[in-house]
Amino acid sequence: MRYLYLHGFASGPRSRKAQAFQRSFEQRGIELSIPELDQGDFAHLTISAQLNLVNQLLAGEPARLIGSSMGGYLAALYASTHPEVDRLVLLAPAFDFSSRWEAITGPEKLAAWHDTGWLEVFHYGQQTIERVHFDLFEDARKHAPNPDFRQPARIFHGTHDEVVPIGLSRAFAASHPNADLTELESDHELLNVLDSIVGAAVPFLVA
């Protein structure tokens, strides 16, 4: 069984959430892989390229996935077409990814992104301002906004999330009995409840 953690947008393998999960897995003697999803080229990041990377890493092997924000959306997309994935843990999954970009940037900034080809964002993993190409948005629109996976899943989402509204996870869980939603008094980062999430999620994954 392979275990993979998929980090969020403009994040990386050294994020606090990724490292908390890795420590918990290490304590159980289990390897948790945490790939750098942009493969060193954040500027040309796309959903399709990240899915291809996951496919290359897993190579059809049985797997269980953890995904945070954009990584949660990736995990859901991948699981929807790969039955060898048999369990998922999603942290504030960024369902309806392209529409969230429209809402966050607003029409003027989105138009400028389209016209110039570039958008500047703060990269939390590198602690710098980085550019990302409009291909990210165009490519995201090609993918299902709410991936219809049927594997057992635990979803953890903060009720005060202003980046990815909890309503997206509520709607998904309401239409997917395989997905159990835990609502938490937290924001998008979920850092104040991270220990409890790890404590609940890891036993579910390694059982």
What annotation goes with each model-predicted range?
Residues F25, Y78-H82:
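Aromatic pocket-lining residues of Rossmann-like dinucleotide-binding sites
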Residues V85-R87, L91-S175, A179-A207:
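The alpha/beta-hydrolase serine catalytic core
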Residues P35-L58:
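Catalytic nucleophile-loop/oxyanion-hole region of alpha/beta-hydrolase
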Residues I66-A75:
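Gly/Ala-rich beta-loop-alpha elbow adjacent to hydrolase catalytic centers
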Residues I34-G40, P93, S186:
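Active-site loop/turn elements of alpha/beta-hydrolase fold enzymes
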Residues M1-Q39:
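Short, surface-exposed "cap/lid" segments of acyl-processing enzymes
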Residues S15-Q22, S48, I166-R170:
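Short, surface-exposed alpha-helical segments at coil->helix boundaries
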